[in-house]
Amino acid sequence: MYKRSLIAASLSVAALVSAQAMADINGGGATLPQQLYQEPGVLTAGFAAYIGVGSGNGKAAFLNNDYTKFVAGTTNKNVHWAGSDSKLSKTNETNPYLSAHGSAWGPLIQVPSVATSVALPFNKSGSNAVNFADVNTLCGVFSGRLTDWSQIPGSGRSGAITVVYRSESSGTTELFTRFLNASCSSTLEGGTFAITTSFGSSFSGGLPAGAVSAQGSQAVMNALNAAQGRITYMSPDFAAPTLAGLDDATKVAQVRGVSPAPANVSAAIGAVTPPTTAQRSDPNNWVPVFAATANPNDPSVRPYPTSGYPILGFTNLIFSQCYANATQTQQVRDFFTRHYGATANNDTAITNHRFVPLPASWKLAVRQSFLTSTNNLYIGHSNVCNGIGRPL
């Protein structure tokens, strides 16, 4: 009798542990914020460890509830959220998701998490600061028009330039190609840069000769450091191990005389206003993107700033408004409460990773919309999520 009771108790404990493991809030995606989200305490209770696989895989995992995009071969887990520096396409991603899954899973939420620069670390010995005073020089390096360090005025260096780029679908690539698309002269470069998550297909004239690819931020940095003459585009916390490192122009290039340190993008970010109350029901309006000029038909498109470090953007969070499990619903609310809190929040960790916390006005807009029970956008709103939600 005792033995049977012991076995039964053991099975009950095993079932409980298994249920708890399966109930983790699983997420992953962009590698740009990977180190931030893996910092202890940034993700709140109930969240599984963040898995960095690139923005493209993160979006695909969430939109199709496909955990194999995080871990190949693992089919017994669900996906509950994603990180992406690449904004969801309303036409190609958000609307198809709502058509396929909206009735069963509910609406999705897309909001900015932190603001970021895109730095230009390089591996070429020399004592001179490297400064792309003229953006056309930067464009020439990444189009392949300029092939030697001596063609970068004032660099004090010579030898072949080798571009290192992300091989997978990357939101960091999208942020960078947005800038190239808006800033580079097609006449001078002999082609154009498309806004894309795939750098290999961005420039219409093809990749620079000898360009080297790698998958993920850390692998790109490893490739950068493997040989002299290499340059890449990178999130600030991978580009340099310290804040002071971002200001070291012998290792991380300046653009127009300005380093990618957070202080040099914070003013531009502070000038970006959150969506109005009437605009907040559309996930597209929550994520600002930069372009050469504003778009009168899309309030999320803002012109690039004319001062400060110019290559900048946001990394974003993608969640569902509805979760089938009440505990998970509350855990998602708890994370939003922490991340977008007025006083107790993740700002210290964000700053330590060389990112820029969202302005107070943005955090307030998020709390008003997704954490206020009387708002129709409230996470788990009973009128929206009655009997539906992303699976446990």
Curated annotation (Swiss-Prot):
Free-text disruption phenotype from the record: Strains are still able to make extracellular appendages that include PstS.
Cell compartment(s), UniProt: Secreted; Periplasm
Function: Has both a phosphomonoesterase and phosphodiesterase activity.
InterPro entries: PBP_domain, Phosphate-bind_PstS
Record keywords: Hydrolase, Periplasm, Secreted, Signal
Gene Ontology molecular function: alkaline phosphatase activity
UniProt entry tagged with the keyword Secreted: yes
Subunit structure: Homodimer.
Keyword Secreted carried by entry: yes
A Pfam family: PBP_like_2
EC id: 3.1.3.1
SUPFAM superfamilies on file: Periplasmic binding protein-like II
GO cellular component, one term: extracellular region
UniProt catalytic activity: a phosphate monoester + H2O = an alcohol + phosphate
Induction: Suppressed by inorganic phosphate.
Homology family: Belongs to the PstS family.
UniProt source species: Pseudomonas aeruginosa (strain UCBPP-PA14)
Main localisation: secreted
Protein's name according to its UniProt entry: Alkaline phosphatase L
Signal peptide (from-to): 1-23
